[in-house]
A protein has these predicted regions:
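GIY-YIG nuclease catalytic motif and its immediate N-terminal context
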Residues: 1-49, 81-84, 88-91, 95
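N-terminal intrinsically disordered, low-complexity tails enriched in polar/charged
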Residues: 1-6, 102, 113-114
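Aromatic/basic micro-patches that form nucleic-acid/chromatin recognition or nuclease catalytic surfaces
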Residues: 42-45, 49, 54-113
Length: 114
C-alpha cells in the first residue's frame, strides 16, 4: 500500500486556545502559520475531508484529529507534494511525517504531528 504525507494549515487561534499546541511550539513567534502534519494511505484531500467531518470507521473508531477538525483551514500541497513523488511504505511515511514536522518547526512554523 502506498502512503503519503500531508500538511494542513490551522487557524492561528489554535496557538492561543490550545495549551498542548502552544507547549509543543515554544519557538513560534507568530510570523508564520500554524500547521498539522500527518500521513495517510488515502489522498491528502480525502484525508482532510475525513478530519473535517469527524470520520468514524466501521469499527467505531474516530479517525479524525480533533485539532484539524476544529482548526483546520486547508491543505498546503506546496509543503508536501515534492515528498509524495516517491512511493512510501507506512514506516517510511511515519518517519517522513516526523522529519517534515521538525523541519517546518526549524523554519519557524508552529507544527502539530503525532
Amino acid at each position: 500500500m502506498r502512503y503519503q504525507v500531508y500538511v494542513v494549515e490551522l487557524a492561528k487561534r489554535v496557538f492561543t486556545e490550545n495549551a498542548k499546541f502552544r507547549a509543543a511550539n515554544p519557538q513560534f513567534n507568530g510570523v508564520l502559520e500554524c500547521l498539522y502534519v500527518g500521513m495517510t494511505s488515502k489522498t491528502p484531500k480525502e484525508r482532510f475531508t475525513q478530519h473535517k467531518t469527524g470520520y468514524v470507521n466501521k469499527k467505531g473508531h474516530k479517525l479524525s484529529a480533533n485539532i484539524v477538525q476544529k482548526y483546520g483551514s486547508y491543505l498546503r500541497p506546496s509543503l508536501y507534494d515534492h515528498i509524495n513523488l516517491k512511493a512510501m511504505t507506512r514506516q517510511q511515511a511515519l518517519i517522513m511525517e516526523e522529519r517534515l514536522a521538525l523541519d517546518l518547526r526549524r523554519q519557524g512554523y508552529a507544527v502539530w504531528f503525532n
